[in-house]
């Protein structure tokens, strides 16, 4: 970015923030004094040395664990290494003076070794080994390794969260021009975690971070400009930020498909997280293995797929994937044959890249009419892998696979018409196939749809229509892996580590992370924020999630205004949010709450008939609402009946008894008492 343009952008940001005087006054009230003890660089180095020392014992005690347990306890693993008594003295001034060339080269080498391990494997054991190299490289003054270690301290990797130490490292790194550190400081400022709550400062940090090349900062700014968070809402600016990240993600996806990450909602089943469908329970996994060994072909293929891409909480394991696919292929599974072809086409440790073997298995699958096999043959002819480039053959196989509904084939058909590869360019056909593939979530199809809308290629240009799919592609970045580590941290009771990971993802615009962060804050179990901040921050996050279409979050906003959590009691505003959730999202809970407010005239005019109707609608919408609705209607009809009897001989002028206000608050106790009396009566008759 041009320095002058950057300066102008910062001045605009400062101007916008000064105009929002009310917001600034609120921010000043929300600021808290940073009482955390400042950690010297030497103490940070001592902490890194401690990490380095702790892993040595773990390297010796290499106990066998199941993949799900390793994944679950990944944040408790310790880093391997050795102890050096002169560590602190030698390195405490590495920020002040440049390290010797030999030390710098060694630090770079160690960082590259660690980074290679980190990128090439999803195994937690190997990730732990990577951090051994990062620790040693950081000790030698390698800035990139220090960034890795600062992240580990911030997010609580290996069970050693120390936000104060992380901030100290980030501040030193930011002075050295680290865009990752600037992004982290912006994030911490935006929540007031370990630092003053300062949205204006956060925005400046993000601006510098994005100028330096931080994809996270780009994404955060894109979300802020899209939603108008502390900046003037501007779709074009949001589009510009999101496109940069989407281009980066699309380039990665063209080289490999990427790994989808399960985004577990803590709000759906908080009392029984282990049974969440997004994560495979260990007992169920063992049962599936048993069935696979007994010859269940469908289970063999399913386990092969899970291990191939590392889904449902399982580590990516190419050897196990190939093992199950070979067993299923031997039994005649066309899907298994196609996946084996895919493994050999892409190449990995278990199946080295081999076009001839890939062609063999794709052909076997295609002969059975398998869509994945047909698409695989199309890829070989399109790219000329093991066979001469032949766009005609590629088109034929892509069409056959697309007719069977395979989204990757639909995308490649669209791409051929979009780029004019072997066919005349036809943007209408390209749009058609991109759209079909996007309905199944094909990420590159979504990206090219966004490209067409952003540039007006073959369609009418629309910023809003383009920015949403760009945002969806951006959310496929490697940073989404924090969803799993945050989930397992929460499940294991490490609430602070879980919250800070969800909070970062929430800042980047992930709706699920916004809901999960608000849910954790609402529980008041976290210690990294003051209790007085939790409800206001939770309300802010519920609101952001609701704007993105979360019905549960919309009901929560109504609840906060109804009870006065993090804001003043406001029945009228509560009723407004319940109405939105009921009308737009058909939420049974919102219908029930709104019915209660109509029944009692809270924030809206009393309307008994509308209350009855909403109670009935709640029962029809959700079976879970039947019993609450039954009791609510029983109470409503009882009160109405008693009022009719007692007021029968009185004119309106002499209505002195207000049963609803007198008995209303205790109606649930009265109903329970009535039920108890009826049960006693029935039991007595039964014994007679």
From Swiss-Prot:
Membrane topology according to the record: Single-pass type I membrane protein
Pfam families assigned to the protein according to its UniProt record, in alphabetical order: Sel1
Entry-linked SMART domains: SEL1
Keywords assigned by UniProt, alphabetized: Cell projection, Glycoprotein, Membrane, Nucleus, Repeat, Signal, Transmembrane, Transmembrane helix
Glycosylation sites: 34, 162
GO biological process, any: ERAD pathway
First and last residues of every Sel1-like repeat: 107-142, 143-178, 179-214, 215-250, 297-333, 334-370, 371-406, 407-442, 443-478, 551-586, 588-623
Cytoplasmic side: 684-688
InterPro entries associated with the record: Sel1-like (IPR006597), Sel1_AlgK (IPR050767), TPR-like_helical_dom_sf (IPR011990)
Leader sequence residues: 1-18
PANTHER family: PROTEIN SEL-1 HOMOLOG 2, SEL-1-LIKE PROTEIN
UniProt name for this protein: Protein sel-1 homolog 2
Native source organism of the sequence: Rattus norvegicus (Rat)
């Amino acid at each position: 970015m041009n320095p002058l343009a950057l300066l102008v952008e910062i001045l605009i940001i400062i101007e916008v923030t000064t105009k929002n005087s009310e917001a600034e006054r609120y921010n000043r009230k929300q600021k808290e004094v940073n009482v955390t003890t400042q950690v010297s660089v030497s103490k940070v180095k001592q902490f890194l040395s401690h990490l380095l020392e702790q892993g040595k014992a773990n390297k010796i005690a290499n106990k066998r664990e199941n993949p799900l347990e390793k994944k679950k306890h990944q944040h408790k693993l310790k880093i391997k290494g050795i102890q050096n008594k002169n560590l602190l003295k030698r390195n405490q001034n590495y920020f002040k003076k440049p390290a010797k060339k030999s030390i710098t080269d060694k630090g770079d080498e160690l960082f590259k070794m660690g980074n290679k391990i980190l990128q090439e494997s999803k195994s937690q054991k190997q990730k732990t080994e990577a951090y051994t190299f990062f620790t040693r490289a950081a000790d030698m003054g390698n800035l990139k390794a220090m960034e890795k270690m600062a992240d580990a301290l911030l997010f609580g990797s290996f069970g050693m969260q120390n936000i104060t130490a992380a901030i100290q490292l980030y501040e030193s790194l930011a002075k050295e021009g680290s865009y990752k550190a600037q992004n982290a400081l912006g994030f911490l400022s935006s929540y007031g975690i370990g630092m003053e709550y300062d949205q204006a400062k956060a925005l400046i940090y993000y601006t510098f971070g994005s100028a330096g090349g931080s994809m996270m900062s780009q994404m955060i700014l894109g979300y802020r400009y899209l939603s108008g968070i502390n900046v003037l809402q501007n779709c074009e600016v949001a589009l510009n930020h999101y496109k940069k990240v989407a281009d980066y993600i699309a380039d990665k996806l063209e080289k490999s498909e990427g790994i989808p990450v399960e985004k577990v909602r803590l709000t759906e089943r908080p009392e029984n997280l282990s049974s969440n469908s997004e994560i495979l329970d260990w007992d169920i996994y063992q049962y599936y293995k048993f069935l696979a060994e007994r010859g269940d072909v469908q289970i063999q293929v399913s386990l092969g797929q899970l291990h191939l891409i590392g889904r449902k909480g399982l580590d990516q394991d190419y050897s196990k994937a190939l093992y199950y696919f070979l067993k299923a292929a031997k039994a005649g599974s066309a899907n298994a044959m196609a996946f084996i072809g895919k493994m050999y086409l892409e190449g990995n440790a278990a199946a080295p890249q081999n076009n001839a073997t890939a062609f063999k298995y794709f052909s076997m699958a295609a002969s059975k009419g398998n869509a994945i096999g047909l698409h695989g043959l199309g890829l070989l002819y399109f790219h000329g892998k093991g066979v001469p480039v032949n766009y005609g053959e590629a088109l034929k196989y892509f069409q056959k696979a697309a007719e069977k509904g395979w989204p990757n084939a639909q995308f490649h058909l669209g791409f051929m018409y979009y780029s004019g590869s072997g066919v005349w360019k036809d943007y209408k056909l390209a749009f058609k196939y991109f759209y079909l593939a996007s309905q199944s979530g094909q990420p590159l199809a979504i990206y090219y749809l966004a490209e067409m809308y952003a540039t007006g290629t073959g369609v009418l240009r629309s910023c809003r229509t383009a920015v949403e799919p760009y945002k969806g592609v951006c959310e496929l970045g490697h940073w989404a892996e924090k969803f799993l580590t945050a989930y397992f941290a929460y499940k294991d009771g490490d609430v602070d580590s879980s919250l800070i990971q969800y909070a970062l993802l929430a800042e980047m615009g992930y709706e699920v992370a916004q809901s999960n962060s608000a849910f954790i804050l609402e529980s008041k179990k976290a210690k990294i924020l003051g209790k007085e901040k939790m409800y206001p921050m939770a309300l802010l996050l519920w609101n952001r999630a609701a704007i993105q279409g979360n019905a549960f979050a919309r009901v929560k906003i109504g609840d906060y205004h109804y009870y006065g959590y993090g804001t003043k009691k406001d029945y009228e505003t509560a009723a407004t949010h319940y109405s939105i959730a009921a009308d737009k999202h058909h939420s049974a809970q919102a219908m029930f709450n709104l019915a209660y407010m109509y029944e009692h005239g809270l924030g809206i005019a009393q309307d008994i008939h509308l209350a009855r109707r909403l109670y009935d609608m709640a029962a029809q919408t959700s079976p879970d609402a039947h019993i609450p609705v039954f009791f609510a209607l029983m109470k409503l009809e009882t009160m109405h009946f008693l009022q009719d009897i007692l007021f029968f001989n009185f004119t309106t002028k002499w209505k002195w008894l207000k049963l609803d206000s007198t008995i209303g608050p205790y109606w649930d106790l009265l109903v329970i008492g009535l039920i108890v009396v009826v049960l006693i009566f029935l039991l007595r008759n039964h014994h007679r």
